[in-house]
């Protein structure tokens, strides 16, 4: 068994965020996903002779906003470079990227690490740089769409030329969990900004992980290995954990780690060697002669900074410190901007924050999951949820009735007050309506009444159940308990 505690992992992430612009980074070709192969291409995408790229201004705006949200220093001057390598999915045999003068450098992101049976903690992870580049095409392999065993491969260039932001972290990450949480916070941030949908299954957010291990925090860095092919946050965590253990085992058995690229095999839950890793000199970078330098004024940066929304970390702090929510509930609500906005509007309409949180994170999220809906598809208005919550507090309806009417409120988005009136679901909260039913029960169940009076006080629950059954759950529970106890103690 490996002595994991005597080793320290050193992890950095390269995160590729696909920007959701309508057209590609250097041409007007569409970025639509899921259409027939090679329908969103043009001479610029294919690199035909005589074509010239022109930077999409929205790409620059989205990239700067992402940089500012990640606390990066945005350069006043940057440029594009050609990254040269041969692969079938690269139509020009070079990729337009940024090398020595990236858009932004030296930022950071705080992430919350919550693990079962461990104390939660917050970690500040440095970000080396953010640069803009174009995406490559996609190889489609025959058979199972895997290279191994396929008879031929086809190339779909629909993705080629789509705008990417590559976000490179500093080697500040130490565990697979931290790596997964960092990637998750990146996705949360770009979704809040509206610059990307961050869909890992569609390739809108892709992460490559660089991992090495060393003997303690003061030892020099070991040889790093790059891991690819992780399409979920859980895969990132599992791939990191596996690779850390693999490298430690190699070292402890007297072996050597090579600088290589490995693929995560989800089915086998292990990493497999793909190729030796190239260095930057292998790409022969040089400035792209077809694209001029980019100048970004302080005034323009200030305009874009002022357009940033309240980001997830600030919302979490606000929910805990101002709204009194638990750290867990604050995390769940802030995970999606539509949920966060809905929750805040519900509170603004008079609902108590903790009650609003319970309804949003439990009942509403449960309904949406059961019906395979996203929060953006929710028809229920914050005003109507706040009204329903306050009806419970005023004893107009019970919590049980509220849960029963919630699906209809979500489907129709009608006033809870109106729905309760139409269905006759208002809580019975006057003694004169409840006492006759209690008297009926006492007359019908004399043996149970005598048993209660002889000390079997748990029978109170039996009578409460019978009362609720006859009132169809509409009797005020507190009043019902009080009146029943008085009668039974007779």
UniProtKB/Swiss-Prot annotation:
GO biological process terms held by the UniProt record: glutaminyl-tRNAGln biosynthesis via transamidation; translation
Keyword match Glycosyltransferase: no
Enzyme Commission code: 6.3.5.-
Keyword Lipoprotein: no
Matching InterPro entries: Asn/Gln-tRNA_amidoTrfase_suB/E (IPR017959), Asn/Gln-tRNA_Trfase_suB/E_cat (IPR006075), Asn/Gln_amidotransferase (IPR018027), Asn/Gln_tRNA_amidoTrase-B-like (IPR003789), GatB (IPR004413), GatB_C_1 (IPR042114), GatB_Yqey_C_2 (IPR023168), Gln-tRNA_amidoTrfase_suB_CS (IPR017958)
SMART domains found in the cross-reference section: GatB_Yqey
Single GO MF descriptor: glutaminyl-tRNA synthase (glutamine-hydrolyzing) activity
One Pfam entry name: GatB_N
Keyword field: ATP-binding, Ligase, Nucleotide-binding, Protein biosynthesis
Domain of life: Bacteria
The reaction(s) this protein catalyses: L-glutamyl-tRNA(Gln) + L-glutamine + ATP + H2O = L-glutaminyl-tRNA(Gln) + L-glutamate + ADP + phosphate + H(+); L-aspartyl-tRNA(Asn) + L-glutamine + ATP + H2O = L-asparaginyl-tRNA(Asn) + L-glutamate + ADP + phosphate + 2 H(+)
Family: Belongs to the GatB/GatE family. GatB subfamily.
Subunit-structure text: Heterotrimer of A, B and C subunits.
Job of this protein: Allows the formation of correctly charged Asn-tRNA(Asn) or Gln-tRNA(Gln) through the transamidation of misacylated Asp-tRNA(Asn) or Glu-tRNA(Gln) in organisms which lack either or both of asparaginyl-tRNA or glutaminyl-tRNA synthetases. The reaction takes place in the presence of glutamine and ATP through an activated phospho-Asp-tRNA(Asn) or phospho-Glu-tRNA(Gln).
Protein name: Aspartyl/glutamyl-tRNA(Asn/Gln) amidotransferase subunit B
Name of the gene this protein is made from: gatB
């Amino acid at each position: 068994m490996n002595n994991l505690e005597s080793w320290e992992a050193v992890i950095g992430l390269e995160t590729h965020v696909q920007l959701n612009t309508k057209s590609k980074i250097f041409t007007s070709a569409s970025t639509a996903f899921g259409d027939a192969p090679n329908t969103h291409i043009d001479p610029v995408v294919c690199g035909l002779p005589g074509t010239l790229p022109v930077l999409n201004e929205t790409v620059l705006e989205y990239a700067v906003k992402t940089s500012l949200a990640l606390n990066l220093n945005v350069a006043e001057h940057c440029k594009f470079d050609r990254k040269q390598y041969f692969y079938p999915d690269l139509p020009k045999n070079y990729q337009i990227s940024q090398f020595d003068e990236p858009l932004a450098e030296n930022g950071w992101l705080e992430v919350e690490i919550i693990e079962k049976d461990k104390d939660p903690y917050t970690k500040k992870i440095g970000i080396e740089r953010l640069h803009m580049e174009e995406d490559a095409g996609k190889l489609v392999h025959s058979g199972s769409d895997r290279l191994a065993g396929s008879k031929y491969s086809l190339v779909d260039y629909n993705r080629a030329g789509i705008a990417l932001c590559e976000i490179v972290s500093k080697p500040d990450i130490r565990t697979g969990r931290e790596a997964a949480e960092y990637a998750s916070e990146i996705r949360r941030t770009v979704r809040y900004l509206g610059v990307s949908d961050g869909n890992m299954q569609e390739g809108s957010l892709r992460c490559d992980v660089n991992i090495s291990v060393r003997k303690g925090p003061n030892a020099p860095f070991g040889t790093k290995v790059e891991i690819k092919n992780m399409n979920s946050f859980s895969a990132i965590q599992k791939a990191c954990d596996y690779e850390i253990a693999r490298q430690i085992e190699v070292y402890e058995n007297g072996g050597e780690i090579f600088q290589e690229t490995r693929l995560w095999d989800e089915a086998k839950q292990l990493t497999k060697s793909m190729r030796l890793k190239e260095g930057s000199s292998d790409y022969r970078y040089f400035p792209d002669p077809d694209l001029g330098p980019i100048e970004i004024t302080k005034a323009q940066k200030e305009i874009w900074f002022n357009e940033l929304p309240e980001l997830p970390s600030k919302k979490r702090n606000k929910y805990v410190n101002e709204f009194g929510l638990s750290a867990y509930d604050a995390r769940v609500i802030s995970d999606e901007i539509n949920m966060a906005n809905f929750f805040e509007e519900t509170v603004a309409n008079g609902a108590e924050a903790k009650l609003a949180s319970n309804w949003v994170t439990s009942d509403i999220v449960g309904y949406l999951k059961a019906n395979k809906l996203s929060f953006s598809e929710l028809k229920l208005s914050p005003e109507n949820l706040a009204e329903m919550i306050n009806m419970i507090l005023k004893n107009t309806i019970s919590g049980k009735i509220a849960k029963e009417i919630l699906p209809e409120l979500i489907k129709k988005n009608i006033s809870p007050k109106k729905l309760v009136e139409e269905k006759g679901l208002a809580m019975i909260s006057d003694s004169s309506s409840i006492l006759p039913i209690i008297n009926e029960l006492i007359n019908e169940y004399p043996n149970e009444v005598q048993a209660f009076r002889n000390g079997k006080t748990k029978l109170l629950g039996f009578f409460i159940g019978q009362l609720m059954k006859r009132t169809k759950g509409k009797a005020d529970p507190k009043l019902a308990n009080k009146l029943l106890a008085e009668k039974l103690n007779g």
